[in-house]
Regions:
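Hydrophobic transmembrane alpha-helices of secondary-active transporters
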Residues: 23, 50-55, 77-110, 298-309, ...
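Juxtamembrane helix-boundary/capping and inter-helix hinge elements in multi-pass membrane proteins
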Residues: 36-39, 100-114, 139-151, 173-185, ...
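Transmembrane helical segments that form the transport core of multi-pass membrane transport proteins
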Residues: 258-379
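Alpha-helical membrane segments and immediately flanking helix-loop junctions
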Residues: 121-122, 134, 145-182, 205, ...
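Interfacial helix-loop-helix linkers and transmembrane-helix boundary segments
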Residues: 34-41, 67-81, 99-119, 308-326, ...
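Intrinsically disordered, low-complexity non-transmembrane regions of multi-pass membrane transporters
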Residues: 1-10, 210-249, 274-283, 308-321, ...
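C-terminal transmembrane helix pair
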Residues: 336-348, 357, 361-471
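Entry/N-cap segments of selected transmembrane alpha helices
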Residues: 102-134, 190, 250, 255, ...
Length: 487
């Protein structure tokens, strides 16, 4: 085997990974030492992605053009960045879904988790409506000469804001294949704008709360990392830390095994649909592979259930999953996904799309703010501010953005707001299933884009009835008790 620099297949990924690591470490130093970045609450991975993007786009790297020409490989290969973004979201969700869950007796009979899931999906729908209204208006007014797929490009707003760079990359890529020039970069740019929105709007809102004395911002000393205890690291009767196979190796092997199963299941479904209905396969296939993280999540949950059955029947005497290490794997995967997703944006691809991008970015932040502000007061009356801040951070960035904003006003997580993000996301997979169909329907034709708009409104109305009717029923049951207490 050729081990020299001329072997691009051997060294390209290593060079790219080294650059990503360098930007992550640089961003971490800036985040800790520079007051501006410290106060911004911008996640380190987001800052690293923007640094990578700015330097790559502006051509400010140390290498001269003639030096780059002499290299046998491109050290700034966007293809590898796209690949890592695609795999990162799937691996991250698989690792999260493999974690052993514990029954919460206090949550029995409560509807907070399903209502949180419905709130998350309803926000997707509101973002989708705002995006489609903008893209349809722009199409009829200015973009008639473009592909009709442009009219459906607004559906990328919830993919970028609500879902993050992983889904924005996957669905944007499928839109690009259908005729939307620069669709992948457009989706990723919206996701990047979502992070900025979470940081800027979120921090401003927290400062307003502090000035009005409604909440106090936590001191940065309170937000420092805590000590990890043995109880945090492992559960009872887990496999040893170091045996013939290292404990981390077991976790990584489980994740990769589930991802292999995910590939085989996706390939099997794709082959079956292609054999039975080739016409349908042209539409379904890109969506199937684009939403591979959902199939991965389902396969991981099934694997977790099978391992649980093995333990109950004593076929397996020890617990193989370690929640702490699986969380670290998912954290790494999501950090890589965020850095690579932002860094792989091709600014040139956005030429001609700056107006819709700007309108959707502003509209997305505004409608998400108003929608979540209204419903947080109704669904979480006892901790509305904490719930709103965390949900807004997640629905414009990722769950880490929501947690970082929440820690500024609830550093010890004394409210259930942080837990709602996790339990709500699980229910959002169920509530969000129709959304996947609509994402695939919208770009097929102009008529189907309008149908999608109508279906978004109808589904939003159903979720709103669920969210508010349940609350009204509960309030009606508690009202007599409250009257009795006053007597």
């Amino acid at each position: 085997m050729n081990y020299t620099a001329s072997n691009t297949s051997l060294w390209s990924l290593v060079i790219q990974a080294g650059l990503i690591a360098a930007f992550l470490l640089l961003a971490n130093v800036l985040r800790r030492k520079v007051p501006f970045f410290k106060r911004s609450l911008m996640p380190t991975a987001v800052l690293a992605g923007f640094l990578f993007l700015i330097l790559r786009t502006a051509g400010l790297f140390i290498f001269k053009a003639e030096t780059l020409e002499k290299l046998p490989y491109n050290p700034f290969d966007t293809t590898i960045l796209e690949m890592m973004t695609y795999h990162g979201i799937a691996i991250g969700f698989i690792a999260l879904s493999l974690r052993v869950t514990k029954k919460d007796e206090s949550a029995k009979g409560a509807l907070t988790a399903p209502k949180s899931g419905a709130l998350i999906v309803s926000t997707y729908l509101v973002q989708g409506l705002a995006g489609l209204v903008i893209s349809l208006l722009l199409y009829y007014l200015f973009f008639r000469a473009d592909s009709p797929v442009f009219a459906a490009s607004g559906i990328l707003l919830p993919m970028g804001y609500g879902q993050g760079p992983g889904q924005a990359n996957n669905i944007g890529n499928s839109f690009e294949a259908l005729g939307l020039n620069g669709g992948r970069s457009f989706g990723l740019a919206i996701a990047a704008a979502g992070y900025l929105c979470a940081c800027i709007v979120g921090v401003i809102y927290i400062n307003v709360l502090a000035r009005r004395k409604k909440r106090e911002r936590a001191a940065h000393e309170e937000l420092s990392g805590s000590v990890v205890t043995v109880g945090d690291f492992q559960d009872e009767n887990e496999i040893p830390i170091a045996e013939s196979l290292d404990k981390f190796s077991v976790q990584f092997a489980l994740v990769l095994l589930v991802y292999l199963i995910t590939f085989l299941v996706s390939w099997g479904i794709d082959s079956l649909i292609t054999g039975l209905a080739p016409g349908v396969a042209k539409t379904v296939s890109p969506l199937l592979w684009g939403f591979n993280f959902i199939i991965g999540t389902l396969m991981a949950m099934l694997t977790r259930k099978v391992l649980g059955v093995f333990r109950k029947t004593k076929a397996m005497t020890r617990q193989y999953q370690n929640n702490y290490l699986l969380s670290r794997i998912s954290g790494l995967a999501f950090d890589l996904m965020i850095v690579c997703g932002i860094a792989s944006i091709n600014i040139e691809d956005l030429s001609g799309l700056w107006v819709p991008f700007a309108l959707m970015a502003v509209a997305g932040g505004a409608v998400t703010f108003v929608w979540l502000r209204w419903l947080s007061k109704k669904i979480y009356p006892n901790y509305a501010e904490e719930a709103f801040v965390s949900m807004y951070g997640m629905m414009t960035g990722t769950i880490s953005s929501g947690v970082m904003l929440l820690r500024e006003i609830d550093p010890n997580f004394t409210t259930p707001a942080a837990n709602n993000l996790l339990t709500g996301s699980a229910f959002a997979i169920v509530f969000g299933a129709p959304m996947l169909v609509l994402v695939g329907l919208a770009p097929q034709s102009l008529v189907k884009t309008w149908i999608t708009l109508g279906l978004l409104v109808a589904y939003l109305a159903l979720l709103l009835v669920f969210l508010l009717a349940v609350r009204k029923k509960k309030a009606a049951q508690e009202e007599p008790a409250a009257d009795g207490n006053r007597e």
